[in-house]
Curated annotation (Swiss-Prot):
The keyword ATP-binding applies. GO terms for molecular function: ATP binding; tetraacyldisaccharide 4'-kinase activity. It comes from the Bacteria. This is Tetraacyldisaccharide 4'-kinase. It catalyses: a lipid A disaccharide + ATP = a lipid IVA + ADP + H(+). InterPro entries: LpxK (IPR003758), P-loop_NTPase (IPR027417). Its EC number is 2.7.1.130. Coiled coil: none annotated. Keywords: ATP-binding, Kinase, Lipid A biosynthesis, Lipid biosynthesis, Lipid metabolism, Nucleotide-binding, Transferase. Belongs to the LpxK family. ATP binds at T55, A56, G57, G58, N59, G60, K61, T62. GO terms for biological process: lipid A biosynthetic process; lipopolysaccharide core region biosynthetic process. GO terms for cellular component: plasma membrane.
Amino acid sequence: MIEKIWSGESPLWRLLLPLSWLYGLVSGAIRLCYKLKLKRTWRAPVPVVVVGNLTAGGNGKTPVVVWLVEQLQQRGIRVGVVSRGYGGKAESYPLLLSADTTTAQAGDEPVLIYQRTDAAVAVSPVRSDAIKAILAQHPDVQIIVTDDGLQHYRLARDVEIVVIDGVRRFGNGWWLPAGPMRERAGRLKSVDAVIVNGGVPRSGEIPMHLLPGQAVNLRTGTRCDVAQLEHVVAMAGIGHPPRFFATLKMCGVQPEKCVPLADHQSLNHADVSALVSAGQTLVMTEKDAVKCRAFAEENWWYLPVDAQLSGDEPAKLLAQLTSLASGN
């Protein structure tokens, strides 16, 4: 229902306009206070790159963060990552991730980023505290990437990157809750890079698509082409589950059942195992896999995806960030 409201297919969005105006008024006032220096920002001693969204819902932001971290690491840059840690609840903050950190403590996306990149990752409701924790333990970190936080204006940033779903784009264009917008589309004029996940990019936007890899067994780590798996039940607890189901079909998989879950939804063995019957195979996202690995069964697999950016702009962006991190 919410997708139909935000896309404009349902007329119910008009009923929510008063709340949207209030949201826009408050969020605009907050940003104005920071622009006029009525509210103080905090600046880290190293460059900060924000990777965020203008809209609520999944846009492919986490794969972009992983791509960015890996690309900088390949260039010899030591990277730290900070996040709010949505879906997690630590005993205390800031929390610096380790091999023993669970998604219940840190949230699924920070754990995924940590496992994929081996970068220093910290979570905290106050992102400046997370940055301080990283730099205290890893003083050699040269640049910080913040996963989300475009609207967290208390944190000064050197580069802003926005990720857009190229198919859904901005829906009906209204602020939450009548539409999907955290900020209006005009905000794009002030950011450094706009990455468009799928669809048809517009002038100045960087095209991106998600490239699926081989399916990975949660228990054994065995890999195979996902099309070889039979009697598949697909599960996705991400911001936009239909994208994952479409990816499976693109790979030649016709799921017997597709199960969309809420983003950051907590999972347990009983609930997940109930999704599959005897002889069926469960295929989930990598983001779900980090929550399920501890209690996985032999017929559970996940399909990793990697962000693939095209054109000349990614190289220019990476050169800019490498120069920033190197102090040039």
